[in-house]
């Protein structure tokens, strides 16, 4: 059955980013009311102000601050009195190697990627229960199934978030709340642009990164037909799940993937340069603001 967006309240974290802004636009086009959460106030306002329809809301705050999460949900309550769809989408990653990065940066990444969606989901629960058809949707990653050596903290957060949402989904189904997670592979977003120039995980570039449209289509499918997990590229999900049957084989398998990934990485950098997203400055790529 096709999901009816009309007058549904969507709360989307990371709403100023690639996937979040695309989902917000689609929800608004179909008659939904969008509440965007993001740390970047200028970009968030630009996204929300550019949406079709009326009665949208931008709330800029730090998701790692528990008191600000509560204030944001109180604001949603005062304006809409319910949440129909909560989308946990905000995430960060770092190309810093584990043995070189600070303890503070590790804590911050775990706070944003793992703790904040769990706390937000809990704080939003009363408003979700006021909906006739409450949904919780979360952007995970194939990094929640397959370990990434260059970004182990990101892997930690996504493994944990995947497990949490599976458990929450099993529990809340009995209470009438549908929980769905989307597990995309590399997606052409500003976060991936940054990771590409900072020397992130080359395995992400074995195939050309998918578009945000491809990922948003998985969200729409899960609204129409709720599932605990959905993969924008099912073939890639099977590959990583098969590879994880015997983790001890990973050190032998990785060299087979890295060469292809490095070639794809170089190709992607050239594409970003051609699109005017990055520039080469003295042999080092930089994002063009």
For the regions a protein language model found, what residue spans apply to each?
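Conserved glycine-rich Rossmann-like NAD(P)H-binding loop of the short-chain dehydrogenase/reductase
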Residues: 30-46
